[in-house]
Amino acid sequence: MSIFRFIDAEKASYPVAMLCRMLGVSKSGYYAWRTRPTSKRSREDVNLTERIREIHSRSRETYGYPRVHAELRLLGVRCGRRRVARLMRAAGLRGCMRGKKRRTTRRDPRAAPAPDLLRGNFVAGQPNRVWLADITYVPTQEGFLYLAIILDTHSRKVVGWSMDTHMRTELVVDALEMAIWRRKPSAGLVHHSDRGAQYTAISFGKRLAEIGIVPSMGRTGTALDNAMAESFIATLKTELVHRRRFPDREVARSAIFEYLEGFYNRRRLHSALSYQSPMSYEEATMEGAAVA
């Protein structure tokens, strides 16, 4: 902010003459600045800032300047990243900062885990090749709400989820059933998780086998072995859970549902997807496959 702009902002509280004297500028210089026509660049900055505010608001105030810049480009607005960053700083707009994920699942020492088939390689050229699963909890004033999710590694889309008051095996089975119903995967798809007791349970393994899904498991509590799912959980916590206080589980359930299905899958731009939403990225993949 320039000295003259600061004086203009504070003149309702302090005399202009005093402000000019304290800041070492002349009154005539201030009034000349006030009557000077606004530059084209300044007018453009004002208009661009309004567009930025709209995008930031639609993102639930979660987007930092890279995603805001990406959405501006999608809207046909040409401007540089540094300009967007500067205008966001001036407007007091910022994205969300991630916190640290806490361990949720616990390993059953009696269970025999499946081998790690991915070894940290989560790349899939098509949908329904590799799914990643994880569990987290959401605190409410009524108690914890537990959430199980399944991501498709190709698009980062949440293809299955389940919420309940417990984190027994039924929680992850329900998420799996949603993913199966939605996606109707072919045999050979890899389902990757950590070695938590819910995923090593006999009933869960049996359901995978019935569909022809191949289990893969990283080490429990080791983020790199299931990094993409862990990253999604961190995003959910940062952009929703840590910014709200939920009075009960039902309110939390509704908010999470709207975040997953109304925002994340459909609208949230993902840096790893060339700043497309998971749904848009999948649609582009399918269109490309149809043309080929």
Regions found by a protein language model. Give the residues of each.
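Charged DNA-binding/catalytic regions of mobile-element recombinases
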Residues: 1-292
